[in-house]
Amino acid sequence: MALRIFIWIVMILSAVGSVVLLALGNPLWKWGAAIIALCFGVAGVGKALYLKLDTLRGRFHLILSIGALIFCAAIVVGMVSTTPWQIFGLHYLARFIFIVSVALMFVGLMKQGYTLSARDWVVALLLFAALTAIGLWFFYTLYAGATTLMSILVYMSLFIMLEVLAVVQVYLGSSLGVRWTAGALSVMCVTVGDMSMAYFAVSSLPIWETVQYLSWSVLGFIMGVICLLWD
């Protein structure tokens, strides 16, 4: 309980402090995204241990938290390094772990007897297609010179969205369905952040850097809150 309260306090202070520093024009505001991602990772480990590692949800949160901690490292490296393979390598690894965690969760649910009807699949695929079409239109319209490195990152984020939408359909109507819907929103945030990183790289417009780190902060905050809800 004490750890959860501490994480709550750190996340809230980091979010508020980051916004205040941004308003003051202090570049240190970007570190808020890294701190919140760290809180997300630590909260995920705590929830995994609470749920027990021999349960499906426990294993899911453990793998998810590892991805969160690597995502935190990717944000930090992105602020202190300009070496592409270091930055993208960590971002790719974090996204890959996110993909694996959700995939294992989905497969585990299927093994436990949960099923998706043809209608559920159609709904998930239609939502995914609509969101992907909108996202890629904005991505390639604003970032006409999309590099392979950035394109891969965006596609990985979109694939996570497809997985999450499928799990949302499984849990729809339950309290976990609400949380997975919030998780889908957080995946949209990370995708927006990834796209904004590309826009900033090619345009150097400060607005895109702001959107990038704010989007990643929202991702970390939403997922951190979900991981702090123990049940």
What are the language-model segments listed below?
Residues 1-231:
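Polytopic alpha-helical membrane-helix bundles and their juxtamembrane interface segments
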